[in-house]
Each structure stands twice: as C-alpha cells, then as structure tokens.
Amino acid sequence: MTDDGEAVPERAFGWWDMWAAPEDDPREAGGPYSGERETLVRYLRDRRLTLRMKCAGLDAEGLARRSVPPSDLSLLGLVRHLAEVEQHWFRQVMAGEDVTRRYPASDEAFTGATADPAVVEEAWAGWREEVAFAERFVAEAPDLDVLGVGDPEQAPIPLREVLIHMIEEYARHNGHADLLRERIDGRVGQ
C-alpha cells in the first residue's frame, strides 16, 4: 500500500523475467559497429525500441495512468513528448522546417495523454512519423558534421550532437518508463 492507501502491484521480478528472451528482443545484441555513425544510429534505435517494449501490452488506461502522483507523467505522455522532441530536433533544428508543435501548450504532451484509444493511436502514429523522418534525415545526411539550420536562437549544432542528445533523452525517459511500468503492473526489466 502507498501512503494514500492505493494498492501497489506485486513486483514481477526475477531472473526469469528481468530480460527479454533474445528471440523476442528486437534490439541489437551489441557491436562492434562499423563506425561512429552506425554506433550512434543503432544506440538511438535501441533506445526507441526500449520505449516501445516498456509500453507493450498495455491498453489505453494503462498507458495513460499517471503512476507517480502528483506528476502528470505517464507512458503515453512520454510517447507524445518524445514525438515532439524528435520533431523539434530533426524537423525544426536539423532540417529547418517551419512546423507547428504537435502539442502547442508547454505541458500538453503530458496533460493531454488521456485513456482514449484514439489518443493512443494518434500518439503512436505521430511518434512513428517523427522517427521515420529522423531516420531518413540521418541516412541522407552526408556526414555527422551537417549543421542544424532551424533554430536562430541557438548556435548551429552538428548532427552528431543531436544524435547524442537523443540517445540521452531516450535513456532518461526510458528510466522513467521503467518506474512507471513497474507501478502499473509490476513488470520490471526488459
């Protein structure tokens, strides 16, 4: 029980459930990779896949559950937030596109994450769209020194730094996702 009397799910922890079975894990097993670009791209890909894995098997209610009151943080909110982060760094900063934010209010990615299947589908569709754009942009960039052109308030930033930032962004939020998922149904690891 929590301090406010809410039931806490039994922790699903053990060596048997700590890691995904290799045949069920879409992430890379590790390098060596063929260079800096491939290393960064694969690490980012694996962090994105980890987010998907942390959300797998949950319905709209589970994805939208704010598991750590009074925070608005939820797994669905993280998906929406990371779609915005992808859009900002790859479409706006790197590609220089003038696009409207997916969620205009500063905290709307989190506060608008409601337990509605249509909201869930829209969030995943938006995230997939932004990830696909980012992957195309990176694949077509001549090298990692390509400079972002879309943020006049910021010094030009090379693609290399954006990729490192995105790995960090996903790693941070995947840590949140670990705790949120454990609070929802006791699932840990993976």
At which residue positions do the language-model features occur?
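Short, contiguous alpha-helical
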Residues: 2-23, 27-29, 37-108, 149-190
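Short, charged, low-complexity loops and linkers
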Residues: 27-40, 112-118, 122
